[in-house]
Amino acid sequence: MSKLTHFAVLSAVGFTALQAAEVPAKPWLVIADWQTRSAETVNHANPVSGTFGRSRSGTEVIWATPTAAVDFEYYRYKNDFTGTIQGSDQAYGHTTDLMLTGFKQWDWNAKYSVQTLYALESAYEEGVSLSRGFRWGFGGAARWRPDAETDITLGVMLQDRFESGVLPIPYLKAVWRPCQAAEVELRATGLQNGLIIRGYLTADRATRVDLSVMYETLTFRLADSSTYGSRAVSVGEVPLRIGVTQFLERSGTWFVQGSFEWVAFSRHSFVHAGETQGVFQTAATWGFSARAGARF
């Protein structure tokens, strides 16, 4: 799954992080996204060699209220291989990720709530149908807000994974706000696992700086192989990312985001008919991303 990036339901749950102070709540968020990564040498891919690079473009539409959210994402990944790895069973073509995620919350009182979490995704290589690239996730969580500075959500999701079937995945999102100008989030979902630190540079929260370190995963269904049968690829990465979000006017409608990332670790595991048959890693790589969006 993307984000990616990022697991989309987490973007929806964390939508309030984009709310500028002194601006009425706006339930809709529309984002255009672009990202590029440098091409780097692959290793641990004997007997083949070469380079791998990736770029991404897409859009995201979120509807969010304090007790419910729905997030739709479309991303197109261009995967570029060079050298002898190109055309081997350790390479694949361009991929597409369509995802619908969301949550619904029921409040017990001001401190305790329960949530249902859901995700539908089609993640597939060119030449593979939407239905064959389909998978899903469903689960529940409990939310505890002991004070104004602390917000903890803990649960479990059943996730259909191309490479491993259906697995129970822990879900954790813990946010601590020590002051109006700072926020720390610990996130563990199986798809995104790590720490995010946010700093607000202005009193109206119109300018935000993010620093994050994550272990993130992507999984795509690949075209069948005449030798191995069904195929999938699971990508695990550890990006260190710093970004800036800037609202462009006092109404809090239009904003831009930019980020730089250094990916210390990236590993591609290929599953053929349920068994891991190939792996490669890339040297440390860097990348840029840019987003523009509006709230209304």
Residue ranges with predicted function:
Residues 66-72, 108-116, 148-154, 180-186, ...:
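Repeated loop/turn-to-beta-strand initiation elements of outer-membrane beta-barrel proteins
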Residues 21-84, 186-191, 223:
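Short glycine/proline- and aromatic-enriched beta-strand/turn motifs that initiate or cap beta-hairpins
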Residues 75-88, 189-288:
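Outer-membrane beta-barrel translocator/channel fold
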Residues 34-40, 65-67, 74-80, 120-126, ...:
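Transmembrane beta-strands of outer-membrane beta-barrel pores
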Residues 171-181, 242-244, 281-296:
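Outer-membrane beta-barrel "beta-signal"
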Residues 51-57, 92-98, 130-138, 166-170, ...:
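Residues that define the transmembrane beta-barrel architecture of outer-membrane proteins
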